[in-house]
Design a protein with these regions (language model features):
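N-terminal Sec-pathway targeting helices
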Residues: 1-18
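Prokaryotic Sec-type signal peptides and long signal-anchor helices
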Residues: 8, 13, 24, 30, ...
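Membrane-interface motif at the C-terminal end of an N-terminal transmembrane signal
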Residues: 18-34
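Early compact domain cores of eukaryotic multidomain regulators
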Residues: 33, 40-49, 53-66, 70, ...
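Catalytic toxin/effector domains delivered as secreted proteins or via bacterial secretion systems
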Residues: 64-71, 76-194
Length: 194
């Protein structure tokens, strides 16, 4: 039993060390100008690996954004519209405010602190940011362009404890190279009766 515990402990230490080194490397890549010529083939493999890991490890906390981003890995997604039925976003105060004041389709953009881990809005904000909310035929729909901006630095860490900055332009590089594929996600739920 002691041998198993020691191996488990060493495996966890190794995973933590690799994870920390990966975060440092990702931070280094994020500091470069976002231009295709700035990244070697090996750098793109590093970014792609981080992208896949980010989706796999983030899925338990952020299943919707992991779903959106993972589908970008499939060439068959390119240019498509994919509809997902889920009411996960209806509990958001931000979304409820938009529905309470709805008169026409509205583009969604949360305040910057909404993306911070621990904020009650971060799961919905990450999945639906830049989307357009509209109500039609008793349904609430949010159309989200699943594509990466060339320049956008997002802080996903815990304030005062952990600073995890993600330069989304790194994923834009993969998109430009055809390694990931943009599409439109449409999240749909029944309009709540108020």
């Amino acid at each position: 039993m002691a041998k198993f515990a020691k191996r488990t402990f060493l495996a966890l230490l190794l995973l933590l060390a690799i994870g920390f080194a990966g975060l440092l490397r990702f931070d280094h890549l994020s500091s470069r100008p976002v231009e295709l010529s700035e990244f070697s083939w090996f750098n793109k493999v590093e970014i792609y690996t981080a992208y896949v890991l980010m989706n796999a490890l983030g899925a338990p906390l952020y299943p919707e954004i992991a779903k959106e981003a993972s589908l970008m890995l499939l060439p068959s997604s390119k240019g498509e519209e994919m509809t997902f039925e889920s009411d996960f976003f209806l509990e958001s105060e931000f979304i409820q405010n938009k529905l309470d004041n709805y008169s026409e389709p509205v583009r969604l953009a949360w305040p910057p602190d909404s993306y911070v881990l621990g904020n009650s809005e971060n799961r919905v904000a990450l999945a639906l940011n830049t989307g357009t909310l509209h109500v039609e035929d008793g349904k609430v729909k949010v159309s989200v362009p699943c594509t990466w901006p060339k320049q956008s630095l997002v802080n996903l860490g815990l304030p005062g404890l952990l600073d995890i900055r993600v330069q989304e332009g790194l994923f834009w590089v993969l998109e430009q190279e055809g390694w990931i594929h943009p599409y439109t996600a449409i999240w749909e739920a029944d309009l709540p009766a108020n």
